[in-house]
């Protein structure tokens, strides 16, 4: 494997590591659900640590976006997405520090969270090396 700079020097190194479930397309949702299962058992399936913390994820939308959010969630639940739409008045039971003023709905994904992008990168790199992959860093591909 060739890396122009060093592993994690691109977008991965600047990622906040949010791991969530609901996306607008079934294909993306299926991919992230598989990924979530890997992050939950990263040590067993890949090796190393992912730093995954199941903190839950909240996504607030205005009133005009609520119907689209409800439609997307209804379609994605059949794929295994674990989420619910909260009325802004009920947000306090999940996160009392957020002011719900101006929100039309809040998507709550209790099984989602965040991971450590650097640890995940290192885990996959180590797993690749154990399987015979040579990782060359500081190499630019020109053709």
Q: For each of these PLM feature ranges, what is it?
A:
Residues 1-13:
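Glycine-rich FAD pyrophosphate-binding loop
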Residues 3, 87-88, 137-139:
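Short loop/edge segments at beta-strand edges and connector loops
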Residues 5-7, 91, 124:
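Short beta-to-alpha linker loops that shape the active-site pocket of alpha/beta-hydrolase fold enzymes
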Residues 9-12, 69, 117:
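Alpha-helix N-cap/helix-start motif
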Residues 14, 30, 34, 86, ...:
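Conserved active-site and cofactor/substrate-binding residues in soluble primary-metabolism enzymes
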Residues 17-94, 103:
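Dinucleotide-binding Rossmann-like beta1-alpha1 core, especially the glycine-rich loop
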Residues 99:
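Flexible glycine-/small-residue-enriched beta->alpha junction loops
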Residues 107-143:
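Helical element adjacent to the flavin cofactor pocket in flavoenzyme catalytic cores
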């Amino acid at each position: 494997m060739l890396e122009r700079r060093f592993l994690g020097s691109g977008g991965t190194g600047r990622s906040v590591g949010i791991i969530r479930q609901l996306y607008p397309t079934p294909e993306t949702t299926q991919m992230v659900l598989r990924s979530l299962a890997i992050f939950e058992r990263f040590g067993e399936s890949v090796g190393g640590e992912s730093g995954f913390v199941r903190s839950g994820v909240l996504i607030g939308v205005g009133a005009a976006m609520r119907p689209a959010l409800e439609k997307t969630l209804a379609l994605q639940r059949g794929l295994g997405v674990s989420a619910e739409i909260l009325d802004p008045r009920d947000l306090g039971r999940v996160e009392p520090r957020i002011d719900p003023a101006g929100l039309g709905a809040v998507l709550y994904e209790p099984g989602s969270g965040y991971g450590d992008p650097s640890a995940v990168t290192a885990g996959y790199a180590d797993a690749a090396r154990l399987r015979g992959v040579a990782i060359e860093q500081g190499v630019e591909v020109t053709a």
